[in-house]
C-alpha cells in the first residue's frame, strides 16, 4: 500500500513537471545578453515594491561590461557575471533555503535544498551551483519549487533522529526552521532509522553523528579555512559518514567554528552541552582581548554568568570565525577571581580590608618613595581609559616610568607605522609574497594566520619564514633561524630575495617578540632595507607590518606608555601592576612595595603587598585598539564580582586619597583627556592608518647578532590570567603537550 501510494505521487509529480516546462533555451539565445534581457523585461511586472538584499548580501559592480540582468520572481536584478542563481536571489531579497551552501566555502551542491525553478529548464535546478545567465527568469515560490524542497526535506528527515528536546542545537537549528517552513506535515518512511557511532574530536566539539545530514560543511571548513585535512567523508550510500580516517583529534586552533557552521545538532559545543537554551541567554556585542586581533564576538550570558562566546561578523578583522581560545576561555572568568581589597600581613598571609584602608596604605607608601623609583606596568588586558588614568597618576607623582608588558623597554614608539599592521588584516588578501620575521601567526594571532592561509590557497603566494621551527598550515620556506638571514635577503644574496623582488604586493610581518631582543634596532634596520629594496612601501601600498601579541599594546604606545629608564625595574621601590602578570620581576629589589590591581589571582599576586580587585573586560566598558590600529569597545555583559571596581575608577579614587586628584570622574571626561593625547582612539570601529612611513626611522650602527629568534608564545591556550584560570584551556593545553 505504501509503495503504491509512493508510485502514484511520483507519477503525478512527473506529469506536473512535464506540463509546466517548455523547450530548453538554445545556446545562441543564452549568448545574446541584450536580446534575453529585453525579452525578459517585456514580461516583467511593473511598479514592483523595492526589495532589500538578504543577510547582508552586497553587490559591487565596478565594470558595467561585467554586469548582467536576471529576473527573480519578476524583479529585475543587476549582478556581476559569474554569480550563482542563489546569490542573485539573495541580492534580490529572496531567502533561499540551504544546508550545504556556505558563502565562505566551496560549492558542494549535495543537499539539494536550494532547488528553484528556472524558466525553460526541464526540472528544478540547484541554485547554489547554477551560474546565473543573462535574462534568466528565476522562480523561487512556484508549486514545482515547493514540491521539490518538500521532497528533499523528506529524504533528509528519514534518518534524522527525533532528538530536538535534548539537542543543544534546538532553537537555533537550520533543520528545525526549514522543516517547519518547507517540509511536509507527515512522512512516509516506516523503516528503521540508521545510527552512527560518535567521533572523538577533542574536548571542545561534541559529536552526535546520527544527526548528521552529510552537508560536508565541516569537511570543507577544515580543509579550506582551518588548513587541516582531519575530516573527510567515508563510505557510501546509507553507510556514508563523516569522520577521521584514523581515530584522532581535530588539531586546529579554529576547530570550534564547525559548531557554528553545522546546520544541525551533529557538532555542538562540548563545554556548553546541556547548560542553557538560546532563548534564555542575553547577547552582548563585544570584542575578544585574548590576543591583539580584536575579533568581534557576542557574549551570551544568563544572570551573572557568561555561558558562551560566539563570533560576530566583521569583514575587516575576523570575518565570521574566531579562534578556539576566544570561544572557550570564558569559564576562566569565574575561577580564581579577586573579590575584595587585601593587604599582606606580617605572617605573609593576605587579609581582606576595606577600600578606604587599602587605598590609604598605597597612597602613604607612594608619598614615601622618590618619584624616579615609582614604576607602573599595564597588563595585557588593560583598556585605554585605565592606562590613561595610570599614566596621569604617575606623572602627577613625578614619575615617567610606565610601560605595557610585551612592548619591552625600547619599543618603536616614535612612529606609529613602526608598531601596527600597516597593510591591515583584510589587506593581506592582496599580497602575493610574505616574509615572516620572528613571528608564528598561527599561535600569536590565529585570525591573521587564517587570512594568510586564505591568500596562499587562493593565489599560491610564496611565504618565507625566519625563526624557530614552527607548524604552519600552508606551504612555506623556512629560510633560517637568526637575523643573519635578514642581512642576506637585504643584500640580495638569499634565494628568497627574487621572490620579494618579483612580487607585486610583498608583505613583511615582524613579530612583537623582536622588541625584547638586544639587537632590536639592527633587526628593524635590516627589515627596513629589505622593504626599501623590494618596493614594499609605496604610496599605494604599505606592506611593512608589526604583529603585536596582546590587546593593550597598540593603545599603550599611542598613549605614550614608554619608560624613561630601561633600568626602572631594577631601581624601583614602588611598582604598580595593573593586571600585569607576565612582567619579569626577577631583578626587582626585595624591599620594593608592589601593588597588584587585577581580576584574577595569577602570577602578579605572589609578589604583591596590596591587592585591589578590578573588573574583567566582560564586566566593563572600555576601548581597545587592535594590531592594525582599529579602536573598538567592550561592553559589560555581566555584573562585577564581589567588591571589584573598574580599573580607571580605582586609579581615580587612589589619586584622590593621595592628594593629586585626576580631573575626570566619568568615562566621557576621561575620553576627552584621551582625545588630547591620541584622538585616533576615539574613532571607534574605524581603522586609522599611520601618517608617516618607517623610512623616517634614524639609521643605526648596531649589528645583528647570531642569536636565534625564540617563540613569543609557548602555549597558544594559556597566554593571560583569564585563559590560565580556564579549565577548558587547561584540557586543551594538556592534549597539546601529548
Swiss-Prot record:
GO cellular component terms listed in the entry, alphabetical order: mitochondrial inner membrane
Reaction(s) catalysed (UniProt annotation): a ubiquinone + NADH + 5 H(+)(in) = a ubiquinol + NAD(+) + 4 H(+)(out)
Residue span(s) of domain 4Fe-4S Mo/W bis-MGD-type: 281-337
EC number: 7.1.1.2
Known cofactor(s): [2Fe-2S] cluster; [4Fe-4S] cluster
Molecular function (Gene Ontology), one example: 4 iron, 4 sulfur cluster binding
Source species, domain of life: Eukaryota
Gene Ontology BP term (one): ATP synthesis coupled electron transport
Transit peptide per record: 1-27
Name under which the protein is recorded: NADH dehydrogenase [ubiquinone] iron-sulfur protein 1, mitochondrial
Lineage: Eukaryota, Viridiplantae, Streptophyta, Embryophyta, Tracheophyta
Amino acid at each position: 500500500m505504501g509503495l503504491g501510494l509512493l508510485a502514484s505521487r511520483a507519477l503525478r509529480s512527473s506529469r506536473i513537471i512535464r506540463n509546466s516546462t517548455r523547450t530548453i533555451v538554445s545556446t545562441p539565445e543564452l549568448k545574446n545578453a541584450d536580446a534575453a534581457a529585453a525579452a525578459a523585461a517585456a514580461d516583467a511586472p511593473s511598479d514592483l515594491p523595492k526589495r532589500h538584499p538578504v543577510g547582508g548580501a552586497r553587490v559591487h559592480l565596478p565594470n558595467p561590461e561585467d554586469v548582467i540582468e536576471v529576473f527573480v520572481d519578476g524583479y529585475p536584478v543587476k549582478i556581476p557575471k559569474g554569480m550563482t542563481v542563489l546569490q542573485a536571489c539573495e541580492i534580490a531579497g529572496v531567502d533561499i533555503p540551504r544546508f550545504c551552501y556556505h558563502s565562505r566555502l566551496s560549492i558542494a551542491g549535495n543537499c539539494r535544498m536550494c532547488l528553484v525553478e528556472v524558466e525553460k529548464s526541464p526540472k528544478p535546478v540547484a541554485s547554489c551551483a547554477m551560474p546565473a545567465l543573462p535574462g534568466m527568469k528565476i522562480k523561487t515560490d512556484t508549486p514545482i519549487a515547493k514540491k521539490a524542497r518538500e521532497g528533499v526535506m523528506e529524504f533528509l528527515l528519514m534518518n534524522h533522529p527525533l532528538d530536538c528536546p535534548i539537542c543543544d542545537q534546538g532553537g537555533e537549528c537550520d533543520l528545525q526552521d526549514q522543516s517547519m517552513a518547507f517540509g511536509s506535515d507527515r512522512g512516509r518512511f516506516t523503516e528503521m532509522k540508521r545510527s552512527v557511532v560518535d567521533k572523538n574530536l577533542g574536548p571542545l566539539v561534541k559529536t552526535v553523528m546520527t544527526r548528521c545530514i552529510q552537508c560536508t560543511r565541516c569537511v570543507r571548513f577544515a580543509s579550506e579555512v582551518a588548513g587541516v585535512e582531519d575530516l573527510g567523508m567515508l563510505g557510501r550510500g546509507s553507510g556514508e559518514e563523516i569522520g577521521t580516517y584514523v581515530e584522532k583529534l581535530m588539531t586546529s586552533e579554529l576547530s570550534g567554528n564547525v559548531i557554528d557552521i553545522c546546520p544541525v545538532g551533529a557538532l555542538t559545543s562540548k563545554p556548553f552541552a546541556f547548560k542553557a537554551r538560546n532563548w534564555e541567554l542575553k547577547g552582548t556585542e563585544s570584542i575578544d582581548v585574548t590576543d591583539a586581533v580584536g575579533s568581534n564576538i557576542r557574549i551570551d550570558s544568563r544572570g551573572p554568568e557568561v555561558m558562551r562566546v560566539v563570533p560576530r561578523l566583521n569583514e575587516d578583522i575576523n570575518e565570521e570565525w574566531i579562534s578556539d581560545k576566544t570561544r572557550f576561555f570564558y569559564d576562566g572568568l569565574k575561577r580564581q577571581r579577586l573579590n575584595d581589597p587585601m593587604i599582606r600581613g606580617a605572617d605573609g598571609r593576605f587579609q581582606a580590608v576595606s577600600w578606604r584602608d587599602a587605598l590609604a596604605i598605597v597612597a602613604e607608601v607612594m608619598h614615601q618613595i622618590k618619584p624616579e623609583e615609582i614604576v607602573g606596568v599595564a597588563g595585557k588586558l588593560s583598556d585605554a581609559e585605565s592606562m590613561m588614568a595610570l599614566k596621569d597618576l604617575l606623572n602627577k607623582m613625578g614619575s615617567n616610568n610606565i610601560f605595557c608588558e610585551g612592548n619591552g623597554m625600547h619599543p618603536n614608539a616614535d612612529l606609529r607605522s613602526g608598531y601596527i599592521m600597516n597593510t591591515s588584516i583584510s589587506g593581506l588578501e592582496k599580497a602575493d609574497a610574505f616574509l615572516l620575521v620572528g613571528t608564528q601567526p598561527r599561535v600569536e594571532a590565529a585570525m591573521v594566520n587564517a587570512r594568510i592561509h586564505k591568500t596562499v590557497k587562493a593565489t599560491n603566494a610564496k611565504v618565507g619564514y625566519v625563526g624557530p621551527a614552527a607548524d604552519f598550515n600552508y606551504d612555506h620556506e623556512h629560510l633560517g633561524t637568526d637575523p643573519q638571514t635578514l642581512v642576506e635577503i637585504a643584500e640580495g644574496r638569499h634565494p628568497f630575495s627574487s621572490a620579494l623582488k618579483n612580487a607585486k604586493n610583498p608583505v613583511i610581518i615582524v613579530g612583537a617578540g623582536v622588541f625584547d631582543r638586544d639587537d632590536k634596532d639592527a633587526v628593524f634596520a635590516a627589515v627596513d632595507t629589505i622593504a626599501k629594496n623590494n618596493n614594499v612601501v609605496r604610496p599605494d601600498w604599505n606592506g611593512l607590518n608589526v604583529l603585536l601579541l596582546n590587546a593593550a599594546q597598540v593603545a599603550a604606545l599611542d598613549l605614550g606608555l614608554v619608560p624613561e629608564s630601561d633600568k626602572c625595574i631594577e631601581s624601583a621601590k614602588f611598582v604598580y601592576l595593573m593586571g600585569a602578570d607576565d612582567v619579569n620581576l626577577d631583578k626587582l629589589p626585595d624591599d620594593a612595595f608592589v601593588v597588584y590591581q587585577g581580576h584574577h589571582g595569577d602570577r602578579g599576586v605572589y609578589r604583591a603587598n596590596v591587592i585591589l580587585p578590578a573588573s574583567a573586560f566582560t564586566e566593563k566598558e572600555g576601548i581597545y585598539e587592535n594590531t592594525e590600529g582599529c579602536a573598538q569597545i567592550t561592553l559589560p555583559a555581566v555584573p562585577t564580582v564581589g567588591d571589584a571596581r573598574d580599573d580607571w575608577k580605582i586609579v581615580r579614587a587612589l589619586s584622590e586619597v593621595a592628594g593629586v586628584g585626576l580631573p575626570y570622574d566619568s568615562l566621557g571626561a576621561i575620553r576627552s583627556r584621551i582625545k588630547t593625547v591620541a584622538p585616533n582612539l576615539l574613532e571607534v570601529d574605524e581603522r586609522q592608518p599611520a601618517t608617516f612611513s618607517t623610512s623616517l626611522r634614524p639609521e643605526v650602527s648596531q649589528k645583528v647578532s647570531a642569536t636565534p629568534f625564540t617563540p613569543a608564545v609557548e602555549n597558544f591556550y594559556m597566554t593571560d590570567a583569564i585563559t590560565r584560570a580556564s579549565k577548558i584551556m587547561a584540557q586543551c593545553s594538556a592534549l597539546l603537550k601529548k
